[in-house]
């Protein structure tokens, strides 16, 4: 049995509810909302990113990475499957790509893969010099010797 397709306004409502639940640290509610979006639109890049963020907070890193990779792949469709030269946080498609890359960087960092994480953080800074995600600070932490996301200063 296929899940019922939701109307666009319901998809956007669920999507917004997912991010609101994430901000309130209500991870199971966020997961349920993002899964609801993905049941209708399995390529909704920012719902994939949201689900990746839920899994990241639950330390389900393989699942988080998979969601961020799917989100990145979906986001790149807007750019004809090529990485753009510049993105701007204020543009929704750009923001979605930044979230995917940032999520992948955080997963690498939490795993202690500092070289991979720093490379991704620097790529985010190159693409989006305004650095709305704090990638510059994360890269600086790595250069200062902080080995993982969870390491206390």
Task: List the model feature ranges, each with a label.
Residues 7-39, 103, 107-110:
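Alpha-helical segment of the N-proximal tetratricopeptide repeat
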Residues 47, 81, 100, 134-135:
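TPR alpha-solenoid repeat register
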């Amino acid at each position: 049995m296929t899940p019922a397709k939701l109307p666009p306004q319901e998809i956007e409502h669920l999507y917004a509810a997912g991010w609101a639940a994430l901000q309130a640290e209500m991870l199971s509610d966020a997961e349920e909302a993002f899964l609801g979006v993905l049941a209708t639109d399995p390529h909704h890049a920012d719902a994939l990113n949201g689900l990746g963020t839920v899994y990241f907070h639950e330390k389900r890193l393989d699942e988080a990475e998979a969601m961020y990779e799917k989100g990145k792949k979906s986001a790149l469709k807007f750019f004809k499957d090529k990485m753009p030269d510049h993105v701007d946080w204020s543009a929704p498609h750009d923001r979605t790509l930044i979230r995917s890359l940032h999520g992948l960087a955080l997963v690498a960092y939490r795993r202690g893969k500092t070289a991979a994480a720093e490379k991704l953080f620097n790529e985010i800074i190159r693409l989006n010099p305004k650095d709305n995600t704090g990638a510059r600070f994360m890269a600086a932490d790595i250069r200062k010797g902080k080995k993982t996301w969870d390491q206390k200063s």
